Amino acid sequence: MTDFDSIWRTQDEIRTVVNAVLGECIWNLSYNERRMAIELELTKYLEEEEVDMLINQFPVTAEYDGIGSKGTKFVFYM
C-alpha cells in the first residue's frame, strides 16, 4: 500500500532543498507508482559536480536519473 502522506512530506523536503540550493527550477516532481519512486526533473542541466553536490543535500537517498527533455533528472526510491 502506498503511504501518500510520507510521499508528500518527502516531496516537500526535496522541493525545499532544490529551492535553497538552486532556486526555483523544478519542472516536475511526482510519484511514479510503477517505479515506486519520486521523480524529479529540473528546468536546467547540471554539471557532474553540481549533481553530486545536490545529491548530498537531500535528506533521502537520491540517484542521478539522466537527462530529461527540460533538465537533469533524479529519482528517490521509497
Question: Which ranges hold each PLM region?
Answer:
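An N-terminal amphipathic alpha-helical segment
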Residues: 1-36
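Acidic, low-complexity, intrinsically disordered interaction modules
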Residues: 28-70
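Short, low-order "capping/linker" segments at domain edges
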Residues: 74-78
